[in-house]
Amino acid sequence: MSAVPMGATVPRGEAEVGKPVNRGYWERYELTSQFEGAERIAKQWDLSREELDAFGKLSQDRAIRAWEEDRFGSQVLTVDAPDLGEDGTLADTTHNVSRDEGLRETNLEALAGLRTNMPEGVHTAGTSSQISDGAAAVLLMTKEKADELGVKPMATIVDSCLVGSDPVLMLTGPIYATQKLLDDNGLTMDDIDVVEINEAFASVVLAWEKELQPDMETVNP
């Protein structure tokens, strides 16, 4: 993400980046951002700054604990990443990356002192996704292929679904996707041992929590 032009990283006055927005979109919706969508979600689900900060701290605490317990030891490869000069261009040197860069030991007092992303908003850097780099890979194959190769799968994909969500809120998709998957398979949240929900912004997870009523000890543990 650090090398992708974004609203927060493109210097003012530079040439426009990205692709033109379809005219049909302009006629029906406003051009908005995930920051604004997250704030709308917080307002619609009546989420306070204090609630978001508490979740932000919990998220950091859990991430740090996972690394300290070496949960990812067998899954992470160390890489040599290129250094960037002060002007943002690639340097001739590299640095070693062996763990997530965004972990921060924090407390509620420190989080409460952060400036909000938007005026009158409730999200801060402590409750928003970070701009850092990462990569992941998963090897998928059919059961028949796994049997042929004699490999034991770590997990089985039972079902998936595609849902639509309000393009202005845009981050509410996990709510409807979870509801549909549970309904399609005759399950409830009590049947799920561990849940992973993308923490794009704290309000995304907390709105999902209000709708699904899960045991939050099982969510992104």
Identify what each model region corresponds to.
Residues 1-41:
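Flexible glycine-/small-residue-enriched beta->alpha junction loops
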Residues 39, 75-82, 158-221:
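Active-site pocket-lining segment
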Residues 51-148, 211-218:
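N-terminal extracellular/periplasmic Venus flytrap/periplasmic-binding protein-like
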